[in-house]
Amino acid sequence: PYTTLFRSGQKHLLKDVMSLPAQNLSTFQLKGQSEKAPEWYVPYHGKKLRGQALLDQIQLWEERGIVEPSHAHALRECIAHPEWFDLSDRTTVLFGAASEAGPLTWLSKWKANIVAIDLPNTRVWSKILDTVSEGNATLYAPSAETLPADTSIEVLKEKLGANLLTQIPEIAQWLIQFKQNLDLAAIAYLDGEKHVRVSMAMDAIMKHVSE
């Protein structure tokens, strides 16, 4: 049952979905308002550890066996190379962009190009738009209609989004239009059997985009 999709009252096999007629999705671009350089820190006991304070804490963790030496080394390398966090040359597709476990908040601080896919839902897009607006990243979001560049956030919350369960060919065709190399992150989560369906949908889209 998980390998089938219903569109316009017709049942289709998942493997045939990409060849179905699909509505074109438009792209809305939003630039974050922050001019801050990319930053990285470790949240710990209500503090944001960075620099020497973080190095001291890493040393304690390592001495007490809380982190393995390779873990401590990796953290020290991150501190030594702040340039690693400038992702202005990367384009990351987030399937389920508003996911609590996802990297949206960090990517929004690291100048990333974020291609956000999530349900057309006011609450979901309120989170995505507010997060990106406060940061230094650039958002690319799907919309069923072409929206003017000066469209307000309040309107965008109502207009953006695409459904991974019902718009598989639309999302796949939309992603293929991007000329950049895409980093694909399948982080959408749904409860129960819908999670199996959304996982298979993400796999199908990623396979199609990567071919």
Regions found by a protein language model. Give the residues of each.
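Conserved acidic E/D residue at the C-terminus of a beta-strand in Rossmann-like folds
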Residues: 116-121
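Short, small-residue-biased leader/transition segments that mark boundaries at the very start
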Residues: 2-5
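Extended charged low-complexity segments that act as oligomerization/scaffolding linkers
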Residues: 125-179
